[in-house]
Amino acid sequence: MAENTVKQGGIADRMPGPDPDEQARQSLERIKHKFIIMSGKGGVGKTSVSVNLALALANKGYQVGLMDVDLHGPDIPHMLGLSGMLTADDSKKMVPIPYSDHLKIISMESLMPNRDEAIIWRGPVKHAAIRQFIGDVTWGDLDFLIIDSPPGTGDEPLTVAQLIPDAKAVIVTTPQEVALADIRKSISFCRNVRMDIFGIIENMSGFNCPHCGKVVDLFGTGGGEKTAHNHGIPFLGKIAFDPEMVQCGDTGLAFQKKFTQSPITLAFQEIADKMAG
């Protein structure tokens, strides 16, 4: 692997060259819109939302980068059916893995020969890794950079806030109160670091029974919308729960490609329109 790419246990030694912060700044200048997808807790489907928002934007013809900064639990390549390892170009910059002509990916999963090996890093190393994901990657000109962050308000979202000051947050929650309590912490985090909150998405909001057609509120309903209203934050929409979404993620198939007219596909398209608006 190239000298300046991320390695297990730390960051590879760099040859004398451009300042890494300046490289990151130059890379970001070529990206129009940056969104970090956050959640207050795990298990709310945040990564699935990240993947599907990126796909919805790419399907509309935008050039999209999907950056996985969930360094300890990277899943995006698997969810998109991508199994290759990252390579480097002649300038020793990492080349994102292409999913399509309009979507490319970078993730720790694509840097690890043994994907069962744990990443054991402290904050400064995570900061350096994310900075490399921005500045040492041949992103080129992008309309959108979608950043999938781990749950909570730790090192990774803080690093994004520091390195990408114009990033906007999309906060994902489910309707139940335990998730809503944590989303309020995400709102507080964004306001403390002065990150704009673009909006809130209520995921897993209702399940249409395939037998009787009745909508079953597995996790309650309306909590995300109410929280958005109470905090003066735009509510971007509801995404229903569908077992097919889980199946597609497990097998690396694009749900939106397989179910083009699903209410879920249409909901992601509507949110993508708001992001592009």
Located regions from the model:
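Extreme N-terminal, non-catalytic leader segments
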Residues: M1-K41, M85
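Walker A/P-loop phosphate-binding motif and the immediately C-terminal alpha-helix
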Residues: K34-D70, I187
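Short glycine/serine/threonine-rich phosphate/pyrophosphate-binding segments
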Residues: V44-N52, G73-P77, S149-P157, A179-D182
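Phosphate-binding loop that captures ATP/GTP phosphates
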Residues: Q63-G65, V69-R115, I120, H127, ...
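Glycine-rich phosphate-binding loops of nucleotide-dependent enzymes
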Residues: I106, I130, S149, Q162, ...
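Phosphate-binding/switch loop-helix module in NTP-utilizing enzymes
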Residues: M112-V160
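Conserved catalytic-core segment of NTP-binding enzymes
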Residues: D143-F144, P150-C248
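C-terminal boundary of histidine-terminating zinc-finger modules
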Residues: T251-S262
